[in-house]
Regions:
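Short polybasic/polar patches that bind polyanions
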Residues: 12, 23, 55
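Short basic helix-loop element that most often maps to the first helix and adjoining turn
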Residues: 5-20, 76-77
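Conserved hydrophobic/aromatic packing and binding residues within compact polymer-binding modules
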Residues: 7, 21-22, 32-35
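Helix-turn-helix/homeodomain-like alpha-helical modules used for DNA recognition
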Residues: 59-79
């Protein structure tokens, strides 16, 4: 599952604001803000949309052998 830390790191790598991510994922700005602040986890559809748009932009989510989130990697530059 995407974590708030991974979302912030991915946005930083892509040089996207929270507004950029919200618009690209077609979710509300408050959804992104609240998620990244750790206030709540978005509903599955919204979390999937955020993850999908980050992966489409070339971000890979990294997990350790136990499945614990470990960070991100950029697989390509954003087009």
């Amino acid at each position: 599952m995407l974590t708030p830390e991974q979302s912030r790191a991915a946005r930083g790598w892509l040089n996207w604001s929270q507004e950029d991510l919200a618009q690209r994922a077609n979710v509300s700005l408050s959804t992104v803000r609240n998620f990244e602040k750790g206030r709540n986890v978005p509903i599955k559809n919204n979390l999937d949309a955020i993850r999908s748009v980050l992966e489409s932009a070339g971000i890979s989510l990294l997990f350790d052998n136990g499945g614990k989130p470990h960070g991100i990697a950029a697989t390509s530059q954003e087009p």
